[in-house]
């Protein structure tokens, strides 16, 4: 966690506790949302989330979803073999426990109101990965396939979102920034085929970051 992240959480958490001590209980304690993220490392992510608000400004919950590369960045290959084209782009499914820390209303527009929020969490991917390798003859024609799999490598990562939400009655939307500690090649780096470690073909680890949009319903 970087310093900015900790400062934002401390600030909003302090506001939340102060405001909660002076606010009336809300009947809208549950929030469901559909979320879409576009990240660096050429990846997109979609998930569905649920949070239960133990007070108006603190929600506990999580999400389930998947992420995938939309453009391959490094393709393991060698003499007489290459990773099958259907497995060039890295992907995985995940569950994502998280805490939603929401500020009191910071501005209003008609019947709608704006809030700031921070949402720290941990992404837990399926701790298993497999790919098919295409076997080639001297002319580059396919002569068969072999499966390579592993359960080694880091399959989890901490992340956080910082954003702005607009709520009208029970409906709303959010936009903001997301930062993750996920290494999208974390599992594949440990794969070996024909004596060659896949890690040599992938770029150095970079923490993905980008933007997100969410549509939610309160009840």
Describe each PLM feature range.
Residues 1-29, 219:
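Cleavable N-terminal export/targeting peptides
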Residues 21, 134-148, 188-198:
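Solvent-exposed, glycine/polar-rich loop segments of beta-barrel outer-membrane systems
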Residues 28-32, 42-46, 68, 89-97, ...:
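Residues that define the transmembrane beta-barrel architecture of outer-membrane proteins
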Residues 33-36, 79-88, 144-150, 197-203:
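Extracellular loop and loop/strand-boundary signature of outer-membrane beta-barrel proteins
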Residues 33-56:
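N-terminal targeting signals for Sec/Tat export/insertion, comprising classic cleavable signal peptides
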Residues 49-141, 208-219:
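Gram-negative (and chloroplast) outer-membrane scaffold detector with strong preference
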Residues 131-176:
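Extended low-complexity acidic/polar segments
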Residues 160-219:
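Predominantly the C-terminal beta-signal and adjacent terminal strand-loop region
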